[in-house]
Design a protein with these regions (language model features):
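Active-site-adjacent structural elements that line small-molecule/cofactor binding pockets in enzymes
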Residues: 1-281
Length: 281
């Protein structure tokens, strides 16, 4: 299926809160013909569950793979300092030799991952922190002296070097819950969109028409509709199944994320699904 790329998406919690396991699964994904490996971003999850830091894990994956795109889908930028995040991402892009994708979103579990640690869980506040944070991250990646005065953050005449390997920046994919519009207007400013559809269960898929509506809305807010732009969707397939994926590609899909984890069986079942390869040749 020309132009479509397929990646494995994995949790960083529970049985998957083991960085050694995640690195092993990433290596299997690369050997099995997948184009990418992305992991979740959680600070806490169910009581008693293990959690692996996503970016430390991605750094380890970068050193053990050479071809697959890697990253975290989706990072809650509102609970990270943007200048530290900018430095970390530039370093990861260097470590991976230009294979990093930066996923950004509002974040889930506002009580467990924001309020419990003294962070403001209000969605409006988090949206504002994301917008200012992205301004700062991109400004610091420019390789030029950068200053910023926002309502939440301030940066004074800072120069960050080296710049990321990928220029003008690593791809930034914005996640959001459709049909809420704010995240998709943000996505229109960057390099890709990763919609989660309200009312669609974890084991279900949106219709191709739902995806097409989200894509059209986002593209309508881009200044250059012809510029490269990724449309990312997660789903569940059972081996090669072009008939499942092709209607979504017709709706604009460019990246299929195979959603794997405990909800699809054992870790051994995850290994087997990865080794079966992507749903399209």
């Amino acid at each position: 299926m020309p132009g479509l790329r397929c990646a494995v998406g994995l949790p960083n919690v529970g049985d998957y809160g083991d960085p050694h396991l995640l690195v092993d699964l990433a290596c299997r994904a690369e050997r099995s013909g997948w184009h990418g490996l992305f992991i979740w971003d959680h600070l806490a999850y169910e009581p008693g569950w293990a959690v692996a830091d996503p970016y430390v894990t991605v750094a380890a994956i970068a050193t053990r793979t050479s071809r697959v795109r890697i990253g975290v889908l989706i990072s809650a930028l509102a609970r990270r300092r943007p200048w530290k995040f900018a430095r970390e991402m530039a370093t990861l892009d260097a470590l991976s030799e230009g294979r990093l994708v930066v996923g950004i979103g509002l974040g889930s579990q506002p009580q467990a991952e924001f309020a419990a640690f003294g962070e403001d869980p209000d969605p409006g506040t988090r949206h504002q922190l994301i917008d200012e944070g992205l301004d700062i991250v991109c400004g610091l990646w420019s390789g030029q002296p950068f200053s910023y005065e926002g309502s939440r953050y301030r940066v004074e005449d800072s120069l960050f070097l080296p710049t990321p390997v990928q220029q003008p920046r690593p791809p930034i994919w914005i996640g959001g819950r459709w049909p809420a519009r704010r995240s998709f207007r943000r996505a229109a400013r960057f390099d890709g969109m990763f919609p989660i559809f309200e009312g669609v269960g974890d084991a279900e898929m949106p219709t191709p028409e739902q995806l097409a509506a989200a894509v059209e809305y986002t593209l309508s807010h881009r200044t250059d509709r012809a510029a490269p732009f990724d449309v990312v969707l997660e789903g569940q397939s059972t081996g090669q199944d072009p008939r499942l994926v092709s209607p979504y590609q017709e709706a604009g899909l460019t990246w299929w994320i195979e959603k794997l984890g405990w909800f699809r069986g054992s870790v051994d079942a995850t290994r087997r699904r990865i080794e079966e390869g992507p749903p399209v040749p």
